[in-house]
Amino acid sequence: MKQQRQLRRREADETAELPADLPPLLRRLYASRGVRSARELERSVKGMLPWQQLSGIDNAVEILYNAFREGTRIIVVGDFDADGATSTALSVLGMRALGCDNISYLVPNRFEDGYGLSPEVVDQAKARGAQLIVTVDNGISSHAGVAHAKTLGIPVIVTDHHLPGDTLPDAEAIINPNLRDCEFPSKSLAGVGVAFYLMLALRTFLRDKGWFDERNIAPPNLAELLDLVALGTVADVVPLDANNRILTWQGLSRIRAGKCRPGIKALLEISNRDPQQLAASDLGFALGPRLNAAGRLDDMSVGVALLLCDNLGEARVLASELDALNQTRKEIEQGMQAEALILCEKLERSSETLPGGLAMYHPEWHQGVVGILASRIKERFHRPVIAFAPAGDGTLKGSGRSIQGLHMRDALERLDTLYPDLMIKFGGHAMAAGLSLEEHKFEQFQQRFGELVTEWLDPALLQGEVISDGPLSAAEMSMEVAQLLRDAGPWGQMFPEPLFDGRFRLLQQRLVGERHLKVMVEPVGGGPLLDGIAFNIDTTCWPDNGVREVELAYKLDINEFRGNRSLQIIIDDIWPL
């Protein structure tokens, strides 16, 4: 039932003016990813966009400066995902380093509080003595929460990156690159990126006011926070535009050099990752899921505590706790995915084809895992998916994932305009969104969402594609080129890791684990023998000893085991010939 994907090759921008000394392969890869000048390849901090272009930031730093001087109790209110956890930890660490002692944090519980700065969360902050609230990775849609804080006499600074609605909360300051009047060129900052920029601006303001001289302290080196910026940016799957690549590269470089938080070191250890060989993908696929597991199944305060702690021994205990939660999350997800596939089969049988947009619900699904489920089903069937779980009060909480061609938040906004009583609330981005609705309205939502996707989305976009960077020559299938590609990143969302295609003789094939296909192949036109592995293969099709030749979509990789390094390929797709 899994959709067969079609191969398409990228086209390079022939007008790109890239450095003449770049290797031809890198010129091709960069040009096909929209890089047009050497400036976009800058990875040093001097290439970062200036904080001065973020609207609202001047007002925010002045409020914070006054709070610092007066000893105001500041509560940072975060979010329960990896971006929210890193944003929270960065803000607390940053303000402490800048000289603020009266600061704490609060992370809403996914199951008890829901998302964002709600009135109930404001009451919790008030109970902890809040005199100023700073939101990180949330707040842009928290109208009621901000209004409630105002009635309690608590000013609010909102820092967020989610798309704003037609109206903004009545906060004392709002920093969000996606505000309509914000001139900051990068609209892809993660929440942790926005928080980092606020710390940069605050340090400058404090220096100009003589804050550090008065206290006879040196201004802190905020680059020490870039490990958190890299982790949150990659884990939140925001596009790695030029500015985010700088932030991520700088953070990766610090982690590789061992200059990172004990909590990140502990996450690296528990996930068996060598810091010196760390890639951006490791942040997204190894560290991020473990950190996210706290917010999905338990309480993200555990994750924030891990990132804040200064003791490696304590960090190892917390990382082990997160690892156990992540294993539980995987088990829950596997069961939910099996149930989702049964629902898809029923939908397919009832209408002979799957709807263009899938909305699915099961009364036993876990609301902390529906986002991952939606992502998995989207990948399998290449169409927008929203998965729902019961919230326990007669309502459902849904998490959506989209494909190129359908802006998920805009689609929900259109549904809200057409059917104002259908949803309770919604929010998000182009590729991901969250929402809630009354349980008895699910079937109506399922129908309306499917109709809207059918109306909005070109059917051709429902055909899954593998987008390749073309073939490699035999000479390019080498350790040197694999290392060149590893060093040419960071690769990530909207700046994908190089993927190549070619025809190979299939010399050996066997299953390892339960669902991974280990192969040895040789290029049809001649070249080196290559070990390869395809993860999560369809075991109803593979291994197939009757297949002698295959077309592969693959990544060059360096396999490191017990101190030995060897070339291998990671297979994304395999087609028998």
From Swiss-Prot:
GO molecular function list: nucleic acid binding; single-stranded DNA 5'-3' DNA exonuclease activity
Cytoplasm as UniProt keyword: no
Keywords: Exonuclease, Hydrolase, Nuclease
Top-level taxonomic group: Bacteria
Gene3D superfamilies, alphabetized: 3.10.310.30, 3.90.1640.30
Family: Belongs to the RecJ family.
Protein name: Single-stranded-DNA-specific exonuclease RecJ
Origin species: Salmonella typhimurium (strain LT2 / SGSC1412 / ATCC 700720)
Gene giving rise to this polypeptide: recJ
